[in-house]
């Protein structure tokens, strides 16, 4: 009948509307879930960029926020869906209530699962970030030492051994400790010094991997039997805070390594028996302040196996040396550049190397022998060449002294300048006073050229 057809049409329309509302609810759920995941992703990204000290706290907060947001979204969606169901029921008595309730249940289930997934992802990423940025703390308390990670650091009496690459922070005070980086470590190690004071102690890396010592706050290490800091490979000493590090040894060098880089830090070095800095291949000092008192050489860079190795470069730094033997001695090139200030008081030569290149800053030398000495390749103690991997015929640098921009002042008991090769002054200033009768103010075996600058030579 016509009434039956009308009733059937109304039921069909109500069913269609219910389907549309279910679709809308699912779409809303999808959008809400997407927003939740996006929020979690953004939170995770922000968390990754924070410092390591607050990573765990921030990430936990992110996880909690994500969960709370998801719960609130689920509750809101449930309420809105419930209200929609009620309105639909009131307006159209033929609508199936059970269909709306099923849709609501599915929506809540989807949101709950997505919130759980988001929390799981955030927690997993948090654990990964923490693992990558972990710093093991080694705390010295007088006669005891405590480490925050016994799997990477072992303590045997007064011997502390670092067994894995990574970052380690030393704090506290102690005496008679030996900190060792095991030779089995193949990747770089960073040791942070945070106000640590160690007496009769040393840091030694037996690994060929790079060792970085980062001074967080003023620290000191003194040794009575070893090099205060020694590295079999490359050693870098730096500070992002402008802090100072005091190193001393009564029996050996203050610092010994294959190569040494001193960057943006203040170093006070004392050796009562040997050198302030002793390196094999190279020493680089930049943006730093270095004070050295040494019974032997202030800085020695000598490679007995390679005639083109053994270099020193000082850039934009203040270096003060008081040495019983030589101030600075290298087997290859010695360069002072930028806005550097180098002051040397030496019992023997002030500066010594094969090629001495002074292009910036000021250099003040007081020497018991030659002020500046450019010499043929030999080692300090011997001219034996049996261990060379190349030969003296492979020399790349000429034997020479080049002054081009620096201001150099010399007071010497020997020769003011002594070059077994050439002497060239292109710009800058050279002031030389020489006191002994048997030597010269400027002595060279090759060619002497003054093409610019100012030269004063007073003496023989």
Predicted regions and their residues:
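Alpha-helical and His/Cys-centered functional microenvironments
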Residues: 63
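A composition-driven surface/loop motif
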Residues: 1-37, 46-49, 55-59, 68-72, ...
